[in-house]
């Protein structure tokens, strides 16, 4: 499991320009991530997803996020997420630990 505080820094640096995490947070370029764990791809209410995201049909958890965050366009070809990914496994683990805490409270 990753370090939540380090993960928060990763989120602020690499994700917060497009995403929010708090309950009731607004969608930006990317969807609000509250309730992410256990939700299927392309299901955040009120966000306009590509068909690729809606049709991927996986459920977000630690394992699916580890693969997705390494290379989003490889995992979901056709996603509109313009992000190259996080190559360092430790950074992904930290980010996922932060997301698990921040998107469920």
Curated annotation (Swiss-Prot):
It comes from the Eukaryota. GO terms for biological process: mitochondrial electron transport, cytochrome c to oxygen; mitochondrial electron transport, ubiquinol to cytochrome c. GO terms for cellular component: mitochondrial intermembrane space. Heme c binds at residues 15, 18-19, 81. Pfam families: Cytochrom_C. Gene3D superfamilies: Cytochrome c-like domain (1.10.760.10). Keywords: Acetylation, Electron transport, Heme, Iron, Metal-binding, Mitochondrion, Respiratory chain, Transport. InterPro entries: Cyt_c-like_dom, Cyt_c-like_dom_sf, Cyt_c_1A/1B. Binds 1 heme c group covalently per subunit. PANTHER family: CYTOCHROME C. Electron carrier protein. The oxidized form of the cytochrome c heme group can accept an electron from the heme group of the cytochrome c1 subunit of cytochrome reductase. Cytochrome c then transfers this electron to the cytochrome oxidase complex, the final protein carrier in the mitochondrial electron-transport chain. This is Cytochrome c, testis-specific. It comes from Xenopus laevis.
